[in-house]
Amino acid sequence: MGNRAVRKWKKTRMVTAMLAVCSIFFGIIVGCKVKSNEKSEMLPIITIGTDQFEPYNYLDSKGNNVGVDVELATEAFKRLGYEPRFCVISWEDKEQLLSDEAIDCIWACYTMTGREDKYQWAGPYLYSRQMIVVRSDHDIWKFDDLEGKRIAVQATTKAEDLFLHRIESDLPTVSQVNCFSATEDMFAAIRKNYVDAIAGHEAMLRKFVDDGEGAYRMLEESPYRSALGVAFRKGTHAEL
């Protein structure tokens, strides 16, 4: 990604963050485990379950959490008098961790669409498209070319639901839907030709495509557009 593109992306990211913070998170924390009106020199901590992938949440060279979701969460909870603590979780365990109160919320480029009744949501704060990435040397250009192919997705995501046809779309029937825990694992699989295509959030995949120096390309079609939100345990934030 060139310097101009990076600057433009950062500017857009900050504008989006401020708009989202001002319009969504006013008063959302009533009912959390730690009361925000406690008088203490230390801010009460809210634990955020997250998954690491750029540009939403990742570690910089100093080991600090940075990214779109990190900036949004930090600013939102700062205004509400909380100190966010980011906890990288196993994505497959997110619901159990939330239920057990090991985390207070899930903030990780998490899709609200189709899960509206499953959690107490704050959002949407951004929108995302599900996209498909293939190797540049593969003859796959449109959805129909995916018929009978092997697909890599991240476990328990919308991409998995789409290719297992739990969600209606124009995608054809494929021969395999291989579920991985991390984006890096999916790209390792396609690099070794274990799978023919990868499906997932556009921004997440775009970073790997851009860093791939021409090894990968993204199909033009999108099978699904989704709203992103912050998930709390149902019944804990009735004022939303």
Task: Please report, for each region that a protein language model flagged, where it lies by residue.
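Short loop->beta-strand "edge-of-pocket" segments that line small-molecule binding or catalytic clefts
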Residues: 46-52, 66, 144-160
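Ligand-binding cleft/hinge of the Venus flytrap
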Residues: 58-61, 73-82, 159-180, 209-214
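Hydrophobic residues within well-ordered alpha-helices
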Residues: 76, 98-99, 146, 190-191, ...
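Flexible hinge/capping segments at coil-to-helix
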Residues: 123, 134-151, 235
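Extracytoplasmic small-molecule ligand-binding "clamshell" domains
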Residues: 38-110, 117, 178-179
